[in-house]
């Protein structure tokens, strides 16, 4: 049985074509635990993600890798005071860490607010004022940390800041 069959009922016609799908999941369904971690238990070494970039770098991750690294990120967030319902803006461009952060935020029940790396400082400030944010996780590239830090300072400077792959003054490095 596949993990999805735990939460989906399918009906097929005589030619094997899908005719109906019914979702059947509990009220406390959590994608991170119920799908990602379940896959990590059932098929830990199965390839879950193949990542590459325009510079020719490539990385591959198994379900066990994503489960472990998302749990580590979830612990970092929890230790920093991020809790269920807290809002976290994420601008990770095309970094593979996006997947660890996304699953981690699902695990703790935080709300991920996606943010493009192309936003100006004023755009970020607008979002901070519209949606009280407890944290921001961003790429270290393209001057994004400077724009984020500037917007946070203008907004009153109360949220936690993380980046990935590189140490940036004023930000904790999530990796």
Regions found by a protein language model. Give the residues of each.
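A generic structural signal for short
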Residues: 24, 62, 89-91, 112-113, ...
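Generic structural signal for beta-strand residues in well-ordered domains
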Residues: 40-42, 81-83, 154
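Conserved AMP-binding/adenylate-forming core of the ANL superfamily
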Residues: 45, 49-103, 120-125, 172-175
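N-lobe entry segment of adenylate-forming
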Residues: 1-61, 65-78, 167
């Amino acid at each position: 049985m596949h993990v999805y069959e735990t939460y989906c009922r399918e009906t097929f016609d005589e030619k094997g074509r899908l005719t109906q799908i019914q979702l059947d999941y509990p009220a406390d369904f959590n994608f991170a635990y119920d799908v990602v971690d379940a896959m990590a238990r059932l098929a830990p070494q199965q390839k879950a993600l193949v990542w590459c970039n325009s510079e020719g770098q490539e990385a591959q991750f198994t379900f066990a890798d994503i489960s472990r690294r998302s749990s580590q990120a979830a612990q970092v967030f929890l230790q920093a005071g991020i809790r269920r319902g807290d809002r976290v803006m994420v601008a990770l461009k095309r970094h593979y860490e996006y997947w660890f952060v996304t699953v981690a935020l699902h695990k703790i029940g935080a709300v991920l607010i996606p943010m493009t790396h192309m936003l100006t400082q004023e755009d970020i400030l607008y979002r901070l004022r519209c949606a009280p944010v407890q944290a921001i996780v961003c790429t270290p590239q393209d001057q994004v940390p400077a724009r984020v830090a500037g917007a946070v300072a203008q907004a009153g400077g109360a949220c936690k800041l993380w980046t990935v792959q590189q140490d940036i003054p004023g930000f904790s490095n999530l990796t």
